[in-house]
């Protein structure tokens, strides 16, 4: 994993310079970096020092590449994965960076794909249903284990000393903004989509939180805050300390933080309802503007002003997309394929796409359920697992690859149909991210499966471009930026000339396969819990095995 920065001309949207910094610690999912303490299954942590390194290396790199005068830099925008949270002390220092807590896993950043709080999410949803909590429907009927409250419940239950020591539990996005400008201003995007906050009613009641765990009764006042700021606002000015580390001028405007998926919407020029954006990478987020709030089963959330001021913003998603393909390549692609790709001077992804693209639709006889990392929408269940149906002794890697690609496209089609059936129009489809940028084969499959033309982001770094747009908003017109999002998007948002159009004969064939996919989706997602029973047994046996190894 990495952090990325772009320097953008606010008048034209031209990306003048780009810099990338790989995270030193990457994703911590096996053992802690210093103590080497082993982590259980479904954990995904990060080290916050990596985030500061990104700022200290990428921003000076942008200035060096562009030869820009720091006086010309009018604003900074920050976006982040979410829900990605960390406990901090009263000085804003992450607890994992204090020696006494460095060996405690719960003191680290919990990445969005930390799924070890599924038990807590299940309990939260059960209690909320029993109490008829109104917020459930605005999250598609379920709160995901990826969101803030289940993760905080896990901390309170498994590491109460960490919960007690935390002066605040913050989204990483808000923490970075705090590091930049010294003000703790939480954004309405992560609060609304990930922390059960509403701009009219605030958070759920103290009584509800107490029913989850006694320690959580006063969580809003003790660990969170009701002081929430809208995306598009200015959080503050760059501190002298961070100015020294980045090479920028103290006082440079810093925007209220945002989420990587949501901030990409203006980057592709979307400023009105009816246009869905897919941000496609390891996972996929589906973003959509609306005129009013509609209850959509299995959506991740709907938040007023959550994406752009003046509109409600809808979010849905798939927990695993590109990670499927990475898994296949890591474990099941033969050496002969790797040598063939090397000989042709292309990546293994390109080779698999070429081979898969030469297959006829349905030729492999395979059908998959794209749940290798659970299901975010519309089933909202991290305990679901993947499935591949139809394999024979003749099945080849490219056939499995194509089946996985098609399954992710079917998952997106289910999301689109669910929104439409709930009264939320989707008339245009856009895509951004690494897959949209690099893989024509996958994008054509999506166009055929959804029967929609797909427009592609004009920037390979759509989240960073979107953040730059909000940085220009934070600066304001008096400082060379913009006062209104529509004006900023008109100058800075962009899409490519190339689009992917559905091929009629492919659409017809995929309709047949999609009907079969829906049968599997309903049966294994709602009717038969065999996946959960198998996962439970796996976890029990894994724990037993790990204990035996430790004793040995």
From Swiss-Prot:
One Gene Ontology biological process: L-arabinose catabolic process to xylulose 5-phosphate
Gene Ontology cellular-component terms listed: cytoplasm
Q: Which UniProt keywords apply?
A: Arabinose catabolism, ATP-binding, Carbohydrate metabolism, Kinase, Nucleotide-binding, Transferase
Report the EC number(s), separated by commas if there are several.
2.7.1.16
* Any Pfam family matching the protein: FGGY_N
What Gene Ontology terms describe what this protein does at the molecular function level?
A: ATP binding; D-ribulokinase activity; ribulokinase activity
What SUPFAM superfamilies has UniProt attached to this entry? Answer: Actin-like ATPase domain
Q: What class of enzyme is it?
A: transferase
Q: Which reaction is catalysed here?
A: D-ribulose + ATP = D-ribulose 5-phosphate + ADP + H(+); L-ribulose + ATP = L-ribulose 5-phosphate + ADP + H(+)
- Pathway per the UniProt entry: Carbohydrate degradation; L-arabinose degradation via L-ribulose; D-xylulose 5-phosphate from L-arabinose (bacterial route): step 2/3
Q: Report the sequence similarity comment from the record.
A: Belongs to the ribulokinase family.
Family matches, as PANTHER family: FGGY CARBOHYDRATE KINASE DOMAIN-CONTAINING PROTEIN, RIBULOKINASE
NCBIfam families noted in UniProt: L-ribulokinase, PRK04123.1
What is the protein name given in its UniProt record? Answer: Ribulokinase
Q: State the species of origin.
A: Bacillus licheniformis (strain ATCC 14580 / DSM 13 / JCM 2505 / CCUG 7422 / NBRC 12200 / NCIMB 9375 / NCTC 10341 / NRRL NRS-1264 / Gibson 46)
Q: What is the lineage of its organism?
A: Bacteria, Bacillati, Bacillota, Bacilli, Bacillales
Q: Which gene encodes it?
A: araB
